[in-house]
Regions:
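Short helix/loop capping segments that flank catalytic or ligand/cofactor-binding pockets
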Residues: 14, 102, 209-210
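C-terminal beta-sandwich/jelly-roll accessory domains of carbohydrate-active enzymes
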Residues: 173-182, 196-264
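Residues in well-ordered beta-strands of folded domains
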Residues: 4, 92, 201
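Short loop/turn segments at secondary-structure transitions that flank enzyme active sites
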Residues: 9-11, 97, 206
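A conserved mid-domain beta-alpha-beta active-site/ligand-binding segment of alpha/beta enzyme cores
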Residues: 115-191, 195-205
Length: 264
């Protein structure tokens, strides 16, 4: 059984003012040297610097294992990014049963309500979070098979207004600013099944897909289906066409099954 340890992060306080001595990023080499039986080191992330903290904890082959994190409005999109980008082993918002409830004063301090970012002050929408996790649960066997490969990638608005995910024959340009979107906070997870087939979980973003093939420079959709997973696989709820696939802008959380082709 793998042995893991998670820790309270340094928030700039004097050692002793918080639970000190754990495997914070700067002390991980010491822990790895002295505690060789520990397999996984994980951060409890309540600080606003979420992505840079994750980057620090995936060094030297350490898998990303987030045993605790906040339940503010970044919780859902960060879960998509942890799985799609870092191929994380664990993502566990603390006080899961209270998602969506107003923060107490203590939670507010832990979750970063002393910042100017409104999303850090706002509880995660529980319906949105449930939908994200239903889609991830349905995809789980396929996601696990893609861990450690470039077939599984993700984008998040915390990286900027635009981001490009490259999959050999296609580039997926993800945008979080659009006249079709009412928010600038979102994420996108893309799972490549084969050269032309993809599963995509979108949350408040727009997608533009381009061919990277010089001999086949143009791209179009053979099909774009929205749906969910059941025991026997993907179940289509509706097929998108017309203006829906011209704009490819999505508000809320959706699971898409996309089939592409390239031509000249």
């Amino acid at each position: 059984i793998p042995l893991s340890v998670n820790c309270w992060l340094d928030k700039g306080q004097i050692p002793g003012k918080y639970p000190t001595g754990g495997p914070v990023a700067k002390l991980m080499p010491v822990w790895k040297y002295a505690a060789t039986s520990i397999d996984i080191y994980g951060p409890d992330i309540y600080i606003p610097a979420f992505l840079s903290t994750c980057d620090q904890y995936v060094k030297d082959g350490n898998p990303l294992y987030i045993a605790e994190c906040a339940t503010h409005s970044y919780a859902g999109i960060r879960e998509l990014y942890v799985i799609g980008h870092y191929h994380g082993m664990c993502y566990s918002p603390f006080g899961f049963e209270d998602i969506g409830q107003p923060f107490t004063m203590m939670q507010g301090m832990l979750f970063g309500m002393d910042t100017s970012d409104e999303l850090l002050k706002t509880p995660q929408n529980p319906e949105e979070y449930a939908r994200i996790n239903r889609y991830l649960t349905g995809l789980m066997p396929l996601l696990g098979a893609a861990y450690g490969s470039k077939r599984l990638q993700a984008s998040i608005s915390e990286n900027g207004n635009e981001e490009t995910l490259s999959f050999q024959a296609y580039d997926f340009k993800i945008a979080y600013e659009s006249r079709f979107l009412s928010t600038k906070s979102g994420a996108c997870l893309v799972l490549k099944m084969d050269a032309n087939n993809f599963y995509v979980i979108v949350k408040d973003c727009a997608i533009a897909i381009k061919s990277t093939q010089d001999m086949l420079p143009y791209t179009d959709f053979l099909s774009v289906e929205e749906g969910h997973f059941e025991e026997n696989g993907f179940v289509m709820e509706r097929r998108l066409n017309g203006d829906e696939i011209t704009t490819m802008a999505f508000e809320g959380v959706h699971l898409l099954k996309i089939k592409l082709f390239s031509y000249r």
